[in-house]
């Protein structure tokens, strides 16, 4: 006896992650999803980029999509409650919530939301992200927003954590100049290209982080058609800003700090200028293995 399993269309295969067409972020807002290997500095990058957009006069919303809910603490200077925790308190009757229950104002007016997630080993993080966007729309909190940044958990590219790609205009990939980070970046490129067939998301570019040099990133970019949009060296002030629970824009303006601030402002300006989307071509695993490293 044989049976045939049909390949599900994008967004199908899980009731939890199929996007409700009514839960779209309004046209006009610049929506960016930030991905990268776990621990590479996505939250630091997202928060400082949000701060940079706000410095340019934009109304910014940052949505943390990690159960650790630590995406926005450098903006708010505290750990804020998550959407999933707040919804549980009202037995998921969202009509009982006020915006101040789950949205918090951070540095320079950046609005912050932590979607949170289900307990480890249960549920779907993508479902939580979808519910967060739905809640924001129900309360009309996206209507006057210029920029939305999704800070996404690790390099997981399953249907659930690929959910922010369904809302985004661009994806930025944060990487270091090492094999593991670039290997993860390649998987993310594959996921974005798959989503781009049915959604508006496109590759915006690469953010080189915690790296003095970019030679390995450059090799990968040259082979795949990607482009480095910003380069943040391993500056100790960035590490200290996390310990101080603040953005790089709140640090003492030393030469290193000002250089980092200007790089974030430049990245924000470039993204606002309708950056040319990239048509990246992911490599096979063996190709990356052979490409990277030294002769």
Swiss-Prot record:
Cited function: Component of the dark-operative protochlorophyllide reductase (DPOR) that uses Mg-ATP and reduced ferredoxin to reduce ring D of protochlorophyllide (Pchlide) to form chlorophyllide a (Chlide). This reaction is light-independent. The L component serves as a unique electron donor to the NB-component of the complex, and binds Mg-ATP.
Keywords: 4Fe-4S, ATP-binding, Chlorophyll biosynthesis, Iron, Iron-sulfur, Magnesium, Metal-binding, Nucleotide-binding, Oxidoreductase, Photosynthesis
The protein's name: Light-independent protochlorophyllide reductase iron-sulfur ATP-binding protein
Keyword ATP-binding: yes
E.C. code: 1.3.7.7
InterPro entries the UniProt entry points to: NifH/chlL_CS (IPR030655), NifH/frxC (IPR000392), P-loop_NTPase (IPR027417), Protochlorophyllide_ATP-bd (IPR005971)
Domain of life: Bacteria
Protein residues bound to ATP: 39-44, 68, 209-210
Binding positions for [4Fe-4S] cluster per the UniProt entry: 124, 158
Recorded family membership: Belongs to the NifH/BchL/ChlL family.
Cofactor entry: [4Fe-4S] cluster
SUPFAM superfamilies: P-loop containing nucleoside triphosphate hydrolases
Quaternary structure and partners: Homodimer. Protochlorophyllide reductase is composed of three subunits; ChlL, ChlN and ChlB.
Any Pfam family the entry gives: Fer4_NifH
CDD domains: Bchl-like (cd02032)
Cofactor descriptive note: Binds 1 [4Fe-4S] cluster per dimer.
One GO biological process term: photosynthesis, dark reaction
Species of the source: Prochlorococcus marinus subsp. pastoris (strain CCMP1986 / NIES-2087 / MED4)
Residues involved in Mg(2+) binding: 43
Enzyme class per UniProt: oxidoreductase
UniProt GO MF annotations: 4 iron, 4 sulfur cluster binding; ATP binding; metal ion binding; oxidoreductase activity, acting on iron-sulfur proteins as donors; oxidoreductase activity, acting on the CH-CH group of donors, iron-sulfur protein as acceptor
Catalytic reaction list: chlorophyllide a + oxidized 2[4Fe-4S]-[ferredoxin] + 2 ADP + 2 phosphate = protochlorophyllide a + reduced 2[4Fe-4S]-[ferredoxin] + 2 ATP + 2 H2O
Keyword Plastid: no
